[in-house]
Amino acid sequence: MKKNLHPIMLAGTGSDVGKSVIAAALCRIFKQDGYRPAPFKAQNMALNSYATPEGLEIGRAQAVQAEAAGVPCHTDMNPLLLKPSSDHTSQVVLNGRPIGNRNAFEYFRKEGREELRQEVNAAFDRLAARYNPIVMEGAGSISEINLRDTDLVNMPMACYADADVILVADIDRGGVFASVYGSVMLQTPEDKKRIKGVIINKFRGDIRLFESGVKMMEDLCGIPVLGIIPYYRNIHIEEEDSVGLDYKRMQAVEGKINIAVVLLRHLSNFTDFNRLERDERVHLYYTNNTEDLAKADIILLPGSKSTLDDLYELRRNGVAQAVLRAHREGVTVMGICGGYQLMGLEIHDPEGVEGEIRQLPGLGLLPVITTMQGEKVTRQVNFHFLENAETCQGYEIHMGETRPVPGEAVVPLNKLEDGGEDGCFVNQKCMGSYIHGILDNQAFIDYLLEPYAEKLECHTVLDYRTYKEEQYDKLAEHVRSHLNLPLLYQIMSGND
């Protein structure tokens, strides 16, 4: 029987240093080594979310990490989720259910923090009773000392869990010595003792050239460097936030089916398109440029955390008109979740669920009307699209109800296995659905691409589930080969 290991927390010198991906790698490594790990992030801020099997909502990163660990995702893995709805306000999701909107000042003030702290601590305790080890993830930088008293996710959480903290730094952005040294030295003496190692991430070039740097860092900080993880391009793990979109190509190309995802200001769940990106028949790009939209074969309207605000902006910047013009010229238009709502005749928000805009006309491509509601629908679904016999899978996360225009006979796109219906189908080039993950299903992708078969040559069908498992294994191998794993196990066994 495997010896129980201490929890481990991957803390960061800043945001986007690679904590989430390294956490996924360690989840897979521990699984490979015979443990039963589970991920945990007390508080996550992200627009990318996922529905658990119980129909509750967590951050997508923890769902990915759970998949890497080979365990079902659960709200205890991410008890507190903040979903930004504007520059200053976020929807607060506690234990998988929304409890209201908060601006930054309201959220970070001390009043009410202890209740939230008790909730995230209880979630950790429940998780730790079922799994070992717990692979914890911090948020942003551990050096925001002005927020120390109200922090729920970094060093106070590590102290509660009695976790060994590993500091992750991104050498690719420069200043790695200052960021590591500063992060360590800004901690209290007690917290400083808890930091047991450093991982240098995203290294480019010959690692041997940094050997002297490792010794300097260890001498400066008094903490061992556990590994230098090289930058990679050939491993594909779902990203947590839309920062990765900055590195994706934004224009059409020759010789492929060009699929344009409309780049909304409040775009959410962009992981809906990861499977399409891996299809060798497809070139997928993100844009809000009207000329680039005109070059697409298929336009996808994605999910949005603020649908009415995005609709207002699409009308203001000319993208709405460009989508309608492209559709008249034979381009396929499909909407998912918020994008489905955008395609209807009208969107109403009588109670101000999203904000100050109470009503706007939609694009008018689908004979449906959406009314925003305070209660959120969150669930996993099995479904069949149109008359297709294959069972497909996906999940819903939305706060609106979409109904046919009175007097209109609407054809649903999907029939759910529980007897319900979803979406609206006009023809093969005009449709919408609430189901995230619909484009992870090969049968639906083939149907979507079918009108453009003349552009295609022979291709290999991608089994996306197998592909993702292969990527987790590749990631684990990459991290394992550059990490002092025996020392990490020694630390987590309490023998450091």
Swiss-Prot record:
Gene for this chain: cobQ
Segments forming domain GATase cobBQ-type: 256-444
CDD domains registered for this protein in UniProt: CobQ_N (cd05389), GATase1_CobQ (cd01750)
UniProt-listed Pfam families: CbiA (PF01656), GATase_3 (PF07685)
Superkingdom of the source species: Bacteria
Tagged with keyword Metal-binding: no
Primary role: Catalyzes amidations at positions B, D, E, and G on adenosylcobyrinic A,C-diamide. NH(2) groups are provided by glutamine, and one molecule of ATP is hydrogenolyzed for each amidation.
Protein source organism: Phocaeicola vulgatus (strain ATCC 8482 / DSM 1447 / JCM 5826 / CCUG 4940 / NBRC 14291 / NCTC 11154)
Active-site residues from the entry: C337, H436
Membrane-spanning intervals of the chain: none
Protein name, entry field: Cobyric acid synthase
UniProt entry keywords in alphabetical sequence: Cobalamin biosynthesis, Glutamine amidotransferase
This protein's pathway: Cofactor biosynthesis; adenosylcobalamin biosynthesis
